[in-house]
Amino acid sequence: MAENERTFTAPQSLLDSNLTFLNDEPTPTTITLTRERCVDPSLINSFLRILRHGSDDVIRQKLNNYRKPSSISEKKCDAFLKQELYPNWQIRSSIISFCDQEATQMKAETDRKFSNTGSSATGTITDARIDPYAAREKLEDQEARYRDWTRVKEWVANNEKIEQILTSTTDRILRQNCEQNKNYLEQFAQFCKDNT
């Protein structure tokens, strides 16, 4: 089966010079996702950390200039939302969705490969007579595949929860600093529909 691959680039507004981490490593600005990266998400986690730092972690600082209620502040808030925050949230959501789709495919492929119906069950008996370790190797392969699937599903669930917490906290901060009566999470959902 052909490998799925998708590339994401961090929004330019996040790549400012004050974004440095310990170890002085260069900041990754682009990531190409594959199934292997979903199974071992260390690079994805680093990329998500950069995205989260550039928006949700520093939102109060970015909105400090917009505290006074006026039409100028509201326009600045809208510009910040549409040019920085919502694209950032959309990238993060797409990354998590990609790995979720890969997990679904992994489960379906593993279930298909190891179903005990038809000729594959007979083949296992024949293989067991020829190679006494074949059944054990098949079981180990099956367990490893399900372990990878479980790891990806847990990572997806974990990151969906993190995103839920971050977006609801950011929504609350936006209501305090921009427009109190707007539902920013609904606006984000509409932004995603308009930009897919």
Q: Which residues are covered by each model-predicted region?
A:
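Non-coiled-coil alpha-helical tracts in long, low-complexity regions of eukaryotic assembly proteins
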Residues: A2-D131, E140, Y184, A189-T196
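Charged, alpha-helical coiled-coil and adjacent rod-like segments in eukaryotic scaffold subunits
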Residues: G123-T196
